[in-house]
A protein has these predicted regions:
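Secondary-structure boundary elements
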Residues: 78-80, 94-165, 173, 242, ...
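Hydrophobic/aromatic-rich core segments of domains that either
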Residues: 122, 137, 169-252, 256-258
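Generic structural "secondary-structure junction" signal
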Residues: 19, 26, 43, 56, ...
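Intrinsically disordered, low-complexity N-terminal segments that are enriched in acidic
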Residues: 1-84
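"Short basic amphipathic alpha-helical interaction patches in structured regions
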Residues: 86-93
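Residues in well-ordered beta-strands of folded domains
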Residues: 25-27, 42-44, 75, 207, ...
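Short helix/loop capping segments that flank catalytic or ligand/cofactor-binding pockets
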Residues: 82-85, 245-247
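Short, surface-exposed linear segments at secondary-structure transitions and domain or protein termini
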Residues: 47-50, 95-97, 227-236
Length: 269
């Protein structure tokens, strides 16, 4: 499948800002299951590119002059491959063990531990696709998709206790459960063809390391839709949680109020 992607992020400030810096994960990863056919980033200031610790294509946008808004636009076309059972084709140098570490957003709580124990094998840190799909189904039923119920600072434990959240919360609950059993699992940010789900085009899901009879490696799962990843997905970045894989994340100096508008349009071509 080929996906045409247009993603605009617009920040507006009530007073002029003296300085702002934004870390961007807005370029699709170079992986066997997806290929960039064209891609362009438009920013208002100096934007330097680099590869981060997880192998994500990253950019650092810096604005040193007074500004009342920041507009970031990415456009391009990506060719994706239909995967068998959500199995990634990627061969990586990163040790899976770095994705067994809990973060502030994925710290275990008694409720999370109970969920993990109910769905995952009691002994050892190896799981099958069936095991993690069982966990996915339980999270799908326990945490309703409710826009505005949480924010980017909400933890996995808070979302599970509330019983509501969005895609990043579903991902964090899944990661917290896996990490409590020392199972490698990681956060994925990216895009999805909304025609395949009916939800927003900017999305988050998870990769988890499985050991099936005929496969040992990463399987990609969309917890919010209780399904395996297909060719309707474009992968931007991986990380331990939202904070390490967010499409746009930064800070500013200047005070006042901030509003943000995000518009992502993904169309199969």
């Amino acid at each position: 499948m080929q996906l045409s992607i247009r993603h605009e992020t617009l920040y507006r400030y009530s007073v002029a800002q003296a300085y702002s810096i934004e870390q961007l994960h807005l370029t699709p990863r170079s992986e066997p299951q997806q290929r960039i056919l064209s891609w362009h980033i438009t920013t208002p200031g100096h934007c330097s590119g680099y590869s981060d610790a997880y192998g994500n294509v990253s950019h650092m946008l810096t604005l040193n002059e007074p500004h009342e808004s920041v507009r970031i636009l990415v456009e391009g076309v990506v060719a994706t491959t239909l995967l068998h059972g959500g199995r990634l084709l990627t061969q990586e140098n990163l040790s899976p063990l770095i994705f067994t570490v809990s973060t502030r957003l994925t710290q275990p709580t008694p409720l999370l531990l109970a969920l993990a124990d109910a769905c995952l094998p009691k002994h050892g840190n190896k799981v099958t696709t069936s095991d993690v799909l069982r966990l996915t189904s339980h999270i799908f039923g326990a945490v309703a998709y409710v826009t505005g119920a949480t924010d980017v600072f909400s933890t996995a434990g808070e979302a599970l206790t509330l019983g509501a959240g969005v895609c990043q919360d579903h991902a964090h609950v899944f990661l917290a459960c896996c990490h409590s059993h020392d199972i490698p699992a990681r956060y994925v940010s990216g895009y999805i063809d909304p025609e395949s789900t009916g939800h927003a085009a900017s999305h988050a899901w998870v990769d988890v390391r499985v050991d099936d009879v005929d496969f040992s490696g990463w399987v990609s799962i969309d917890v919010s839709h209780n399904r395996l990843m297909t060719d309707a997905y474009c992968r931007l970045a991986i990380g331990r949680d939202y904070e390490s894989a967010a499409p746009v994340r930064g800070m500013r100096r200047g005070g006042g109020d901030e509003t943000m508008r995000v518009e992502a349009v993904i169309v199969p071509v």
